[in-house]
Amino acid sequence: LFFFVKLSFSQIKENRLSIAALELTKYKVTYDPSYFSISYPNGDVPSDKGVCTDVVIRAYRKLGIDLQKEVHEDMLKNFSLYPKVWGLKRTDKNIDHRRVPNLMTFFSRKGTVSIKSKKSEDYIPGDIVCWNLHGGITHIGIVVNKKTKDNKRYMIVHNIGNGQVLEDCLFDFKIIGHYSYKN
């Protein structure tokens, strides 16, 4: 009975993230990778702008989870564990949570790392997936509770340049990360 209750609670949380992500697709957002100075905690770039990471940040924020704060606090304590891709010597609460490699490190440390596979059944609503688009360009999205037209896999809410959209793109690029995070 305990296992059943635990599983049900987990599924509810995942479904809430899926619903939050789908809700984001109702709003017009222009892809804009600009650096913004934002408030802290609970800071966000202008609501009509964003990138792939902002989809994840905004969906979790709808659940009361502030990834800006959580990533920043973890980076303050564990800066050496995070990627050094940008040559920074200290944290930056305006941008750190908006970088895919930083979110991958955070989810690896604080969430659950799941198998990276080519099997659609390994990906369930509420999962976070990261891809390598090409040449080291990374991307992130959320698996949601909507199936593809052929009913073979769940779809993804992400922003790869056309705003916050729902697409069948799970296996379009090389998967480099697969996580769940429930705080």
Give, region by region, the residue ranges found by the protein language model:
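Low-complexity, Gly/Ser/Thr/Pro-rich intrinsically disordered linker/tail segments
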Residues: 151-183
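Second-shell loop/turn segments in exported
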Residues: 38-47, 89-93, 114-117, 164-165
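Acidic helix-start/capping segments at beta-turn-to-alpha-helix junctions
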Residues: 33-53, 66-88
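Active-site-proximal alpha-helical segments within enzyme catalytic domains
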Residues: 52-55, 59, 125
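Sec-exported extracytoplasmic/periplasmic mature domains
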Residues: 22, 26, 57-65, 72, ...
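...with weaker cross-activation on analogous glycine-rich loops/strands in unrelated enzymes
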Residues: 13-18, 76-157
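Active-site-adjacent structural segments surrounding the nucleophilic cysteine of cysteine proteases
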Residues: 10-50
